[in-house]
């Protein structure tokens, strides 16, 4: 059976829909990212063969989840990142991985400029359903957190007939719990 052995490595808050048949369940809600957790494990496995491409992918995951080392970073985050740099990760190449198309950039700018602030939460909605909407919404949610007085952001967008929400916070508001309700 192809899925007979499942390993879960996660840093998010435990959810009701938890994978129950995991052989190994490594959960660390204080880690910055799953990439940080994988990197820590790899450092302790003598036969670890993290090459430059793997190191770059893991560093990209850390940079993405921490918003370039701004959110949820700790000593372990920087130690994992230093290890990945020693293994050949290139920070400029990682930055290029996150480059946007002009269309995505315009969509993000439109979402941010149309946002409303309510009780410390930025709320933006999109009226279109195409292209890199999910990417633009996630980036807009991140960008809205840089507005003074905003503690959380919610960007609503359509995708395939459904309404999705990209939510972010600086830590004071648990947006995951809000979305679960």
Provide a role label for each language-model segment.
Residues 1-15:
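A short, gly/pro- and small-residue-rich
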Residues 5-9, 24-27, 122, 154-156:
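Hydrophobic/aromatic beta-strand patches that form the interior of the parallel beta-sheet core
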Residues 7-8, 38, 150:
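Hydrophobic aliphatic residue packing
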